[in-house]
From Swiss-Prot:
One of its GO terms (cellular component) is mitochondrial intermembrane space. It comes from Trypanosoma cruzi (strain CL Brener). Monomer. Belongs to the anamorsin family. GO terms for molecular function: 2 iron, 2 sulfur cluster binding; 4 iron, 4 sulfur cluster binding; metal ion binding. [2Fe-2S] cluster binds at C39, C46, C49, C51. This is Anamorsin homolog 1.
Amino acid sequence: MSSTTTQAFSLKTRQAVDEDALLTEEDRVVKEATKGEDCTTRRRACKNCTCGRAELERKMLAEGKKVEMPQMPAGGCGNCAKGDAFRCATCPFLGQPAFDNTSDGKVKLNLTDDI
């Protein structure tokens, strides 16, 4: 049985990799991030509002009309109470801490002594 040994890697024969050769033309195209069409997931207009919602709210307040807050949609995936790691992208509770959805909106405090 003859065994031939071949080196899998040698520092002497290592060639520098041309980083530009790794990218394709499709990779080089700069892609712009897209913004959502509406801001119905927020209760108020953003500080730097660009969609026109801030102007609409100011106009309605000047006319003496009540600014109607959009209804927060109920989550459809059923994972809203578990936390951001389990929530869908359109969850109205995104960014909020996990909660107990069986408590009817009441906060449970643990007031027992540790001693």
